[in-house]
């Protein structure tokens, strides 16, 4: 298949989970969550966001996302179940592709960070999608460069699981609204507020539990 005129190899989810993470992260810009937040704050102060599109719309999205992340940083709480599971998993690296203007990333990254904080065996690395399209194009969602996209790998670089760009219940809602030609942005963010970060945590429990065996 092609994206923006470039040939892209698309793998099924099953194929991805049988593969090694073959990309070298050396020489790439990796952010911790706190470094990512600081970078976005500095960018907005200077009238910029991440990515090539520096339009007023993208700047506005980024400003709103900073507000969302600030809110989640203060209010998000992990469930007892996800805390217990995360505490028991072996060493993993979580690589998250994102951009500052992405609304779904603002709703989910703070929760991913809180989960990673529970266990020092988890190394969370945040990378910008548009600077790492070679990685992004190996982990498409339904053929698209949807973000955030998390790739979990073990210490032998085997891909353990992928997640993103949003919890499945919200993904299905977005799919339906797109098919009906509706504007899903306001609806999806209301869903996030009502969900209180429960769905993403439940999905991570289901993804991580098999890795404990």
Show where each model-derived region lies.
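Short acidic/polar capping segments at secondary-structure boundaries
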Residues: 130-132, 157, 168
């Amino acid at each position: 298949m092609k994206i923006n005129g470039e040939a892209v190899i698309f793998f099924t989810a099953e194929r991805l989970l049988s593969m090694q993470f073959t990309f070298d992260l050396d020489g790439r810009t990796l952010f911790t969550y706190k470094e990512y937040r600081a970078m976005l704050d500095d960018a907005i102060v200077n009238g910029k966001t991440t990515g090539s599109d520096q339009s007023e719309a993208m700047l506005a999205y980024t400003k709103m996302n900073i507000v969302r992340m600030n809110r989640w940083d203060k209010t998000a709480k992990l469930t007892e179940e996800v805390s217990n599971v995360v505490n028991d998993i072996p060493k993993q690296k979580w690589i998250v592709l994102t951009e500052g203007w992405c609304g779904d990333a603002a709703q989910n990254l703070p929760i991913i960070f809180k989960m990673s904080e529970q266990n020092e065996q988890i190394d969370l690395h945040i990378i910008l999608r548009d600077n790492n399209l070679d990685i992004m194009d190996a982990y498409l969602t339904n053929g698209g460069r949807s973000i955030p996209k998390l790739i979990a790998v073990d210490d032998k670089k085997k891909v353990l699981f992928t997640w993103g760009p949003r919890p499945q219940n919200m993904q299905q809602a977005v799919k339906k609204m797109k098919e009906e030609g509706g504007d899903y942005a306001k609806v999806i963010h209301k869903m996030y507020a009502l969900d209180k970060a429960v769905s993403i945590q439940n999905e991570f429990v289901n993804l991580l539990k098999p890795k404990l065996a």
